[in-house]
């Protein structure tokens, strides 16, 4: 038996959301500059809702992404990174994967729409997706302004270990091209040198990482960049993620004291 009657849920959530927003504003709460989001639980949401076709969950989750990005923009967040497709996801059933890639491509094109005026970057290896979706994604991203008040990273074909290995290889390749000796190559491998060759080069590390659907791990997401990020987990599946959940994450972040390993 439900404790709260269905007809009262929406008004109560609206009231709770208002109180959270007022609390963040009144206290001049410290907000994250960069939020990273693992949009997890699309398939589980579809199954729980009784759908045999899990692609419906992907479509509902896709509709949530632009909505969540607008919440970030309205809250004054400068940058958001969304994890849309990992390298591990590429091992899924071919038909399911094809539908997922098509949905993701549509989502990125929506995010890159001129009306949003967002600066968008892809992080990941687009070549893993195939020529047609990779071409569409590049075209969409290149159509966005290079500089804008709100920046979005879309992680597609992304793997954290793969990114770090690629950054080290790129760093050493540049040094070799400049005629570096073996000793100079060793000296060139520094924290700063690797960071300059990551997909997110030149960007701030995420202050807050949000993961939906109850899993409490990074699953390879921004392994290097999230070393000192605050984590926030919710049992809510991504398609059911609400603004009130987002505001709770901001509230909890504002109450934490970041130590950066000290």
From Swiss-Prot:
GO terms for biological process: cell wall organization; peptidoglycan biosynthetic process; polyprenol biosynthetic process; regulation of cell shape. Pathway: Phospholipid metabolism; decaprenyl phosphate biosynthesis. It is an enzyme of class 2 (transferase). Disulfide bonds: none annotated. Pfam families: Prenyltransf. The active site is at residues 40, 89. It comes from the Bacteria. It catalyses: isopentenyl diphosphate + (2E)-geranyl diphosphate = (2Z,6E)-farnesyl diphosphate + diphosphate. Mg(2+) binds at residues 40, 230. GO terms for molecular function: ditrans,polycis-polyprenyl diphosphate synthase [(2E,6E)-farnesyl diphosphate specific] activity; magnesium ion binding; Z-farnesyl diphosphate synthase activity. Belongs to the UPP synthase family. Z-FPP synthase subfamily. This is Short-chain Z-isoprenyl diphosphate synthase. It comes from Mycobacterium leprae (strain TN).
């Amino acid at each position: 038996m439900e404790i709260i009657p269905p007809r009262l849920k929406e008004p109560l959530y609206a009231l709770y959301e208002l109180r959270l927003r007022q609390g963040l504003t009144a206290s001049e709460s410290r907000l994250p500059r960069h939020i990273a989001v693992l949009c997890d639980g699309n398939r589980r949401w579809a199954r729980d809702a009784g759908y045999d076709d899990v692609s419906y969950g992907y479509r509902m989750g896709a509709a949530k992404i632009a909505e969540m990005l607008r919440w970030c923009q309205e809250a004054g967040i400068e940058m958001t990174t969304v994890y849309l497709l990992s390298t591990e996801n590429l091992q899924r059933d071919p038909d399911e994967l094809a539908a997922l890639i098509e949905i993701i491509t549509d989502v990125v094109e929506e995010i890159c729409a001129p009306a949003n005026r967002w600066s968008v970057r892809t992080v990941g290896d687009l070549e893993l997706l195939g020529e047609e979706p990779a071409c569409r994604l590049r075209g969409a991203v290149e159509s966005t302004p290079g500089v804008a008040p709100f920046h979005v990273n879309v992680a597609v074909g992304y793997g954290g270990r793969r990114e770090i290995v690629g950054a080290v290889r790129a760093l050493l390749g540049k040094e070799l091209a400049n005629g570096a000796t073996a000793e100079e190559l060793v000296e060139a491998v520094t924290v700063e040198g690797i960071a300059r060759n990551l997909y997110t080069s030149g960007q701030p590390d995420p202050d807050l990482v949000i993961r939906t659907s109850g899993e409490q791990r990074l699953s390879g997401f921004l392994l290097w960049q999230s070393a000192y990020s605050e984590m926030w987990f919710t049992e809510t599946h991504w398609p059911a993620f609400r603004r009130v959940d987002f505001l709770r994450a901001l509230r909890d972040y504002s109450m934490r004291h970041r130590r950066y390993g000290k």
